């Protein structure tokens, strides 16, 4: 058994174990929720299907999606500080979701659609501006779009007339899994799978970039086409998760770091490991909020930032050699 297989197996088993603990601990031994035949009553089924399963599923899906997107962006730009929202997709999904939440009373499925459209539109704007000017221009354009959309969000919040709506928007912006719904989760799953397929399709491009874009071109890879497909996939992953959770940072940044430290493999070989680590980190963060009194009043986006920032600084300071060999 290879090191990669051993690590991925261990991470998968850890996810199963912790997910099982979360379900059991939430339910407890509610014997009074069973009928005389020992069958689950409607109340216990509701706790499982309307609360625990959607929340755990959203933690796993969001953590894995952000980690996969982060690994792709760090490989594409050959920069360990690249995040999933570098090209504006995160800000676009956030701005669209905030606008919809404030002005329209719509089901979460339509909020999801708006977030995906916002992520894709902002990414396409950045891409069209900088596609002929190289990665530096692409990053700067993404930064400009992120700042513009961030200002638009701040302007909307500062002019909000409803205190209740303003409070809800602030809660959403801090990131949480409390809005998890099974139907929305199932709708977002195909979008995530399409994004993963885009990145799988361009995995060879990602590996060849470690030797430079010119090398990728000489090996029969179309850099511009592959760049667009891979970054489009990242935008789909980001757009499918942010409307459901709000802003959750650092998962897409530190999960690929952990994967590289543990495996030291090619970027395309780190996708699965990064996904498992990202899912595990977000699930543990959610459990900490639910069961540790110290974190009970902290939103998950705040907690991931509080933990992720020191972890990132530690990793950057302790690594004495280049992350990409």
Where are these regions (language model features)?
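Alpha-helical transmembrane segments in inner-membrane proteins
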Residues: 1-325
């Amino acid at each position: 058994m290879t090191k990669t297989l051993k690590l991925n197996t261990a991470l998968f088993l850890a996810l199963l174990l912790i997910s099982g603990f979360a379900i059991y601990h939430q339910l407890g031994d509610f014997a009074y929720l069973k009928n005389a035949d020992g069958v689950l009553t409607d109340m216990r089924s509701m706790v499982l299907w309307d609360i625990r399963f959607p929340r755990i599923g959203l933690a796993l899906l969001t953590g894995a999606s952000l980690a996969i997107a982060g690994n792709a962006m760090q490989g594409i730009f050959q920069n360990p500080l690249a995040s999933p929202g570098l090209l504006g997709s995160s800000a676009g999904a956030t701005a669209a979701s905030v606008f919809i939440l404030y002005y329209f009373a719509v089901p979460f499925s339509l909020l999801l659609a708006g977030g995906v459209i916002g992520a894709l539109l902002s990414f396409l704007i950045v891409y069209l501006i900088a596609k002929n000017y190289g990665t530096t221009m692409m990053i700067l354009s993404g930064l400009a779009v992120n700042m513009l959309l961030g200002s638009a969000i701040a302007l909307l919040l500062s002019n909000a007339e409803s205190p209740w709506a303003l409070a809800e928007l602030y809660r959403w912006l801090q990131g949480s899994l409390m809005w998890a719904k099974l139907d929305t989760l199932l709708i977002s799953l195909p979008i995530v799978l399409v994004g993963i397929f885009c990145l799988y399709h361009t995995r060879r491009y990602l590996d060849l970039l470690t030797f430079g874009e010119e090398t990728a071109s000489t090996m029969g890879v179309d850099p511009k086409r592959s760049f667009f497909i891979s970054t489009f996939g990242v935008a789909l992953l980001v757009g499918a998760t942010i409307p459901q959770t709000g802003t959750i940072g650092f998962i897409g940044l530190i999960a690929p770091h952990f994967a590289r430290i543990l495996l030291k493999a090619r970027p395309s070989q780190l996708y699965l490991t990064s996904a498992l680590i990202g899912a595990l980190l977000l699930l543990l963060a959610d459990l900490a909020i639910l069961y540790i009194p110290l974190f009970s009043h902290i939103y998950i986006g705040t907690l991931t930032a509080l933990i992720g920032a020191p972890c990132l600084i530690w990793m950057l300071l302790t690594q004495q050699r280049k992350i990409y060999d």
